[in-house]
Amino acid sequence: MASTTNNTPIDTVILDIEGTVCPITFVKDTLFPYFIEKLPSILQKFQYPLPTTTTSDNDDDDDDDPVLNILKQLPENIIQSWESIFNHFKNLVDQDIKDPILKSLQGLIWKQGYENNELKAPIYQDSIKFIESFPTVKSKDNQRKIYIYSSGSIKAQILLFGHVKNSSTSTTSSSIDNDTIDLNDKLNGYFDITTVGFKNQSNSYIKILQEINKSQYPQSVLFLSDNINEVNAAINAGMKSYIVIRPGNSPINDEDKKFHKIIYSLDELDL
């Protein structure tokens, strides 16, 4: 395993979302249940069995419905009824399986929730402060950047950071209403499992380094996550990586605490 102790200055930070900048309970206790609650009424508006990609090639109307286009990616035996589709997705959610089709559909349904003001992202205040301030501090080449890497789709990431619940009066981000701000203009890019791969695989972080032109300077990149497997994967790709401990996160064993830097708030970062 590569060492995370290196004097190379950090000018790029990659943030995980749940359990790192956002309470892990928001995804499991708010976003997932919201998706399951809204799913039946969305599925029931279609006629079953759904057309497959092959049978609907000449139906231009099908292409106008983003939900239907996602559902048509499912195996034919699943799209015979709305109940079978619902059970399929509910099973994936219950088992916390990172399925790309599920993530795409969740992103669409969450979009409606954010736009209807039914959903707001409870980003930690220390994380809001860091995201707003880190890029504004000048480095030698003035290229300090923040990226997001999450198993949730990029669309879902943009929605989440675009509808952040804020209790501070000193924010520098654009306001949507009195208690909602948009942090997306502070972020330089987003990655998910469809663009670079799964978060517990080192090759995913190697791809990110290539995408952000940091392959030659991996130690100038810091990845923050609550997941030890993700932290190890990032370190093995050459990055620096710290474990973030937040209320409700899975416990970190003493052995891992010995060999990894631990932080409890992004306020602890001195970059």
UniProtKB/Swiss-Prot annotation:
Binding site for Mg(2+): D16, E18, D226
Enzyme class, first EC level, given as a word: hydrolase
One GO biological process term: L-methionine salvage from methylthioadenosine
Keyword Hydrolase: yes
Cofactor: Mg(2+)
Keyword Amino-acid biosynthesis part of the UniProt annotation: yes
Signal peptide stretch: none
MF terms in GO: acireductone synthase activity; magnesium ion binding
Family: Belongs to the HAD-like hydrolase superfamily. MasA/MtnC family.
Name of this chain's protein: Enolase-phosphatase E1
Taxonomic source organism: Candida dubliniensis (strain CD36 / ATCC MYA-646 / CBS 7987 / NCPF 3949 / NRRL Y-17841) (Yeast)
